[in-house]
Amino acid sequence: MSYILHRLTHLIKANRHLHRAVRCLLVPYRAHLDNRQRRIYDVWQRQHTEQPPALSLLAQQPRISIIVPTYNTPIPFLREMVQSVVAQSYPHWELILVDDASTNETTHQAIRDLAEDVPQLKPFFLDKNRHIAGATNYGIAQATGEYIALLDHDDILHPDALLWVAAMIDRTGAQFVYTDETKMDEHGRPYQPFFKPDWNADFLRAVNYITHFAVMSRQLLTEVGGEDGSYNGTQDWELFLRLTRALQPEQIAHVPQILYYWRVHQASTAKDLDAKPYVIDAQRRALEADSTARQVQTQVERDPQYGAQWQMSYSLGQAYSTDTASFDESTTVGQLLEATTAEMICLTQHNALSAAMLQHLATDAARPMIGAVVPRITDERQVIANLSSILQPSVVGLLQQLSRRSFTKHIYLTARYNLGIIDAPTVVVARTKLAALAPDTPLTSAQITAALCGKGYNTLYNPHVTPEEDV
């Protein structure tokens, strides 16, 4: 069914006039769905609002330099952005605005006026356009804070954004911190909240899930070299890949609070990736460079159905012997290993994997940090339920109420990412990793993934491989 829908969508998009007509017809229905989901989320948010730690309890209170490149920014958006920083409950910040040679003089004047009213605002005006990466790096060079925060010129921060981030730095000593976010429309109305997991390496290589709000150590940023202008349009994602390669997982922290409001308006990347086609090429190059830096062989392909996502196939240069066994709580890992000599073992309830599919999953199962690999699960409620290993239970409950038009739900149904303990109809595991488990471990997906996670392995969900009975 998903293939048929994909082909139908492709045919409609190929006919420009038909595509436009269908989009117009769907506007009222989409608005209805969005309003329904907004109401559900509003109720949930009122029930789950948390207060940040008290400032007085923070032993470390680092100065945070907020870098904002501007270019012909609509004045109302610019003022709202600055006001959201001024309203912060955390006092130790500076706001550095770097105007990237705006052609609209009203932008220059608005920045000067704001600087007169806000002592912590430092304006800089470039005489030549350097694009976002160049303007950001210029701002970083002027910063005096121990940490650098990235903020877009038309977005806004939650009043407690910096306090939550500072509290996380104080508690963990993290060098890189990111938060949850929500999109908002041109009128400032929030919609499409995005609930993120803690550090998730495979997720970051499928889609830039970190995006906003990102705060990083200035020393670390200096060491890795700032933003790279050759990746214009995806400079933040490329930077995040570089930063996280330089860190240990415990140095990366996630604040599970919606603290950033990403404004969607005409031609913004948040609204439509195809509005900036050069971004696509930059994303591909960033992911390929990341693979090279990690010294792994991969094939990077843009997802044909979901253009903001990427599929990364690992090539380890060998074919594996494989075998298939049924899940059985009365059978143990020790008994399984006595019955087969295969290098890769597929444990399943009923689904069949072709030889090609099994080899595809095996390349992931052979990776050092991956325990079990899970192909696509067609039961969407089960996919969302498995998120309880990486998201808060209340968020999982919320997602079960929402439709696929929820960005969070959609991304977790369609992207590759790491999980913990899960319940799945099919998993693929390397023999060497099964051999490291207690021999009396029962053959169930939950028991196997729990034991593997206990050994430090991650589970990998790969929805791009569909068992044959589910096609």
Where are these regions (language model features)?
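Short, acidic, metal-binding catalytic loop of nucleotide-sugar glycosyltransferases
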Residues: 83-92
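A conserved acidic beta->alpha catalytic loop
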Residues: 99-109, 128, 152, 330, ...
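Short aromatic/hydrophobic "clamp" motif used to bind/position activated sugar donors
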Residues: 148, 344-345
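N-proximal low-complexity "stem/linker" segments adjacent to membrane-targeting elements
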Residues: 14-84, 302-331
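Conserved donor NDP-sugar-binding/catalytic core segment of glycosyltransferases
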Residues: 160-191, 351-393, 458
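Glycine-rich, basic loop-to-helix element that forms the pyrophosphate-binding segment
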Residues: 126-143, 329-338
